[in-house]
Amino acid sequence: MKKILAVIGLLFLMVACSSTEEVKSSGSREKIYRTSTNQTTVRNIGKFQVDSSTYISRGKEERIKFIILHYTALDNVGSIRELTGGVSAHFLVLDEDDNKIYSLVPLEQRAWHAGVSAFRGRTNINDTSVGIEIVNDGIAKEYRSDPNPYHPYDHYVDYKPIQIEKVAQIIKYVAEKYNIPARNIVAHSDIAPSRKKDPGAKFPWKELYDKYNI
């Protein structure tokens, strides 16, 4: 009988060790949440092991909150040159009928696309956004010398359907990955209205909604 009880006790301990535990820190009323020891993942820093799963902090959030759309106001060559220099974006969609989307900056890193910006109580939107640059002239060249800063719809350049399809797929991928709501998928002109117009009056926001459910 003693052997049976000992076995039952051992099984109980094994089950307890395989589940999430709530540990009270000594001398404090705070609670520490600890995950299973048998699910621990370990890597090394120098000669020391780093345990990244036994104790998990709940005080965290995703960096990426917004998706910002831009036009480059340059041709393909100029856009590539500009966006591989000091200015950058996470994705570049060229003015070409092909199946390529260019990733210029990894999503986990910050790109320099927003500039001085603010939106929904946040500033410096580079810190919390993914930037998508689309090769498009923006304002047609014959109207760029117009001193009036406000251009009518006809002054803007159309986007190619393939570009919009690519942009839609990027948005859907990033929004799903980081749980970004539609209200946070915005124009450069939304976060810097006093100095930016892109992606311009001819960017088909309604098409994104109607055709791609964005």
Question: Across the structure, where does each feature detected by a protein language model lie?
Answer:
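Intrinsically disordered, low-complexity segments enriched in Ser/Pro/Gly/Ala and basic residues
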Residues: C17-S18, K24-G27, T35, D51-S52
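Basic/polar, cationic surfaces and motifs that engage anionic cell-wall
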Residues: S18-S25, Y143-I214
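Active-site-adjacent loop/helix surface patches within enzyme catalytic domains
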Residues: K31-N179
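Sec-dependent signal peptide recognition
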Residues: K2-L10
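Generic cytosolic/nucleocytoplasmic N-terminal low-complexity/intrinsically disordered segments
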Residues: M1-K2, V23, G46
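Generic surface-pattern signal
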Residues: A6, G85, D210-N213
